[in-house]
Amino acid sequence: MDKLLERFLHYVSLDTQSKAGVRQVPSTEGQWKLLHLLKQQLEEMGLVNVTLSDKGTVMVTLPANVAGDIPAIGFISHVDTSPDFSGKNVNPQIVENYRGGDIALGIGDEVLSPVMFPVLHQLLGQTLITTDGKTLLGADDKAGVAEIMTALAVLKQKDIPHGDIRVAFTPDEEVGKGAKHFDVEAFGAQWAYTVDGGGVGELEFENFNAASVNIKIVGNNVHPGTAKGVMVNALSLAARIHAEVPADESPETTEGYEGFYHLASMKGTVDRADMHYIIRDFDRKQFEARKRKMMEIAKKVGKGLHPDCYIELVIEDSYYNMREKVVEHPHILDIAQQAMRDCDIVPDMKPIRGGTDGAQLSFMGLPCPNLFTGGYNYHGKHEFVTLEGMEKAVQVIVRIAELTAKQQ
């Protein structure tokens, strides 16, 4: 474990923020720097089949050290950080033996407070790694990367019994592109785990069904003084559309298994307005109903417009709930839960109110639930991770490998 923190601090020092709306994969040059570094480190560790694809996926094998028909399993993390907040010049703070109360983030007024984040009350005495209040930390998912790298080193050095272990590091997870170019056949694992979760004990195999909704509104602009019966205000139409969307089914009013509509962006003028929604729901039927609802709203608001004015709606599915694929292979979850219990961790099965590469991979033939990393408050300046949580994640990865070797 001695290099776990060192690895993590090195990885977060590299700016690997991904960028939406870019055709190339990886979407940013910074990701290539970390991917090349990981490839080099894996080669130096003496692992085999180390590859880096032209789409930025690193794959590697730790060969089995025991004989028998043992299934090959995989562990996967992503190297990019969220576009939502700066990941440049990350300056981590290490708070040893946290004693409670507010933690100052840098020299400004920003604090990490248990009033806003009550989970801190559960972390007394632990070592917290925080931001300086100016950037995100990048624990999502460089904690996962560091944990997998450390687990590989532990498995190799301590000669713990295991079958073939396949590992992959992917780009552009935060913008939904990482798994699209993942070669499941080349990866060659029977199942895998993404290491991309939150607090210790989290084990996730349910995620949202997700879709994006883009609405283009074309109006007609004339001088306001002579506008009667002629002007069609695209902004007013946008406001009417949003007024029809259920206000009590938004991200800020929902939790657990509840789905939502989220107006993520809106811009425009009288002539033209654009709206971008995301739709999320765990239930497939409710998911389809939400998409129909958006189409009905657009049709209702657009009824009777002048032929030159119109509302155009495009819905695109992003990913689906991996539950239907993972539950077909219950042993995958059984092994992960047993590994946690063996490490004195109580498994916390909860739905992901989001998505992971594992969701897409599960529908590509690689069942892939999600393991915890020990991190919290992702995508912002209040992000932090505990060193103890990271160490627990390493222990669980190693134990999963060991338990799988007994499955022959």
Swiss-Prot record:
<dbReference type="GO" id="GO:0043171">
    <property type="term" value="P:peptide catabolic process"/>
</dbReference>
<feature type="binding site">
    <location>
        <position position="196"/>
    </location>
    <ligand>
        <name>Zn(2+) 1</name>
    </ligand>
</feature>
<feature type="active site">
    <location>
        <position position="80"/>
    </location>
</feature>
<feature type="binding site">
    <location>
        <position position="78"/>
    </location>
    <ligand>
        <name>Zn(2+) 1</name>
    </ligand>
</feature>
<dbReference type="GO" id="GO:0008270">
    <property type="term" value="F:zinc ion binding"/>
</dbReference>
<dbReference type="GO" id="GO:0045148">
    <property type="term" value="F:tripeptide aminopeptidase activity"/>
</dbReference>
<dbReference type="InterPro" id="IPR011650">
    <property type="entry name" value="Peptidase_M20_dimer"/>
</dbReference>
<feature type="binding site">
    <location>
        <position position="379"/>
    </location>
    <ligand>
        <name>Zn(2+) 2</name>
    </ligand>
</feature>
<keyword id="KW-0378">Hydrolase</keyword>
<keyword id="KW-0645">Protease</keyword>
<keyword id="KW-0963">Cytoplasm</keyword>
<feature type="active site" description="Proton acceptor">
    <location>
        <position position="173"/>
    </location>
</feature>
<keyword id="KW-0482">Metalloprotease</keyword>
<comment type="similarity">
    <text>Belongs to the peptidase M20B family.</text>
</comment>
<dbReference type="GO" id="GO:0005829">
    <property type="term" value="C:cytosol"/>
</dbReference>
<dbReference type="GO" id="GO:0006508">
    <property type="term" value="P:proteolysis"/>
</dbReference>
<keyword id="KW-0031">Aminopeptidase</keyword>
<dbReference type="InterPro" id="IPR036264">
    <property type="entry name" value="Bact_exopeptidase_dim_dom"/>
</dbReference>
<comment type="function">
    <text>Cleaves the N-terminal amino acid of tripeptides.</text>
</comment>
<dbReference type="InterPro" id="IPR002933">
    <property type="entry name" value="Peptidase_M20"/>
</dbReference>
<feature type="binding site">
    <location>
        <position position="140"/>
    </location>
    <ligand>
        <name>Zn(2+) 1</name>
    </ligand>
</feature>
<dbReference type="GO" id="GO:0008237">
    <property type="term" value="F:metallopeptidase activity"/>
</dbReference>
<dbReference type="Pfam" id="PF01546">
    <property type="entry name" value="Peptidase_M20"/>
</dbReference>
<feature type="binding site">
    <location>
        <position position="140"/>
    </location>
    <ligand>
        <name>Zn(2+) 2</name>
    </ligand>
</feature>
<dbReference type="InterPro" id="IPR001261">
    <property type="entry name" value="ArgE/DapE_CS"/>
</dbReference>
<protein>
    <recommendedName>
        <fullName>Peptidase T</fullName>
        <ecNumber>3.4.11.4</ecNumber>
    </recommendedName>
</protein>
<keyword id="KW-0862">Zinc</keyword>
<keyword id="KW-0479">Metal-binding</keyword>
<feature type="binding site">
    <location>
        <position position="174"/>
    </location>
    <ligand>
        <name>Zn(2+) 2</name>
    </ligand>
</feature>
<dbReference type="InterPro" id="IPR010161">
    <property type="entry name" value="Peptidase_M20B"/>
</dbReference>
<dbReference type="Pfam" id="PF07687">
    <property type="entry name" value="M20_dimer"/>
</dbReference>
